[in-house]
Structure formats: structure tokens, C-alpha cells
Amino acid sequence: MVQPGQHRATARVLLHNPQGEVFMLLTHFDPEVGLPPRWLTPGGGVDEGESVRDAAVRELREETGIVLNPDQLGEPVFHAIGRWDWTDGNHHTYEDTIFQLQVEGFEIDTSGWTADEHRDVVRYRWWNPTELLESGEAVAPHGLAEFLVRHLA
């Protein structure tokens, strides 16, 4: 769980299929701090002493069941630094690094999910980037939805 004032580095993987659709997870994140539900790519926090690339591979395995070697990921395609303001007046900052991986499709395996993920992930689906942008749904990090339209359209 993110603490008030904490800086959180995350590693994520932009999974897309040959049709250009993106696999996203809808999460409540942490209802206790009042952040709205939003769509995210698979990923999560970088552990102390862990590289961003290794964290992306670990998180992808935990959240989807996809097993990769770290060198199967190319260079990061999106990087965002920002701040989430909480409804109670607190906030936390973040730095997201997103890698890209094309997949033909897969059956998600949630057996690696933490208790928080089972509580917080509402659903998951493939999105057409333009439909995601035009849906009005919240997408994190800031600017990702616009990037997806430019990058995958």
C-alpha cells in the first residue's frame, strides 16, 4: 500500500495484440485514499535492489501468468512522473516506466495475485486505444491513453 508522501517507482508492460488492442486492468487502487477507479497496464512497484526491467517481468508473471526472460522486453516506450492527490489532502508521487510486448492472446492466470489485487482489480479487458481515449474512463499514468492512440493506431 502506498503511504502519504511516498514516491513509488513502478514497472509496467503494455501488452498489445496484432490488432492494436491493449490489455488493461480496471482497479480501485486503494479506496481508502479516495483515488478513482482507473485502467492500468499490468505492473507494479519496483522492489528495493530490483531493476525496472526485472520488476516488469516479475509483475507481468504475477498479474497475467505470462513468463518472460528480461531480455525479451525491448526498451521502455513510455515514462511518466507525476502526483496523485488523495481526497483526504495527502498525496504520493510516482514514476512509471512502461515496456511493450506484443502477444497473440493469452488466458489470464490470476493465481499470482496478491490479496490486494484480488480486492482492487474490478475487471480486465482488451481495449482499442481510440475507444479507451473516447470512453472518458480514467487511465493511468497521465497521458498514457493519448500515447496509445499515437503509438498503436
What are these model-predicted stretches?
Residues 41-76:
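The catalytic Nudix box helix
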Residues 19, 78-112:
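Active-site-adjacent beta-strand/loop module that shapes the phosphate/pyrophosphate-binding cleft
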Residues 24, 98-100, 124-126:
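Conserved hydrophobic/aromatic beta-strand scaffold that supports enzyme active sites
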Residues 24, 75-78:
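A structural microfeature
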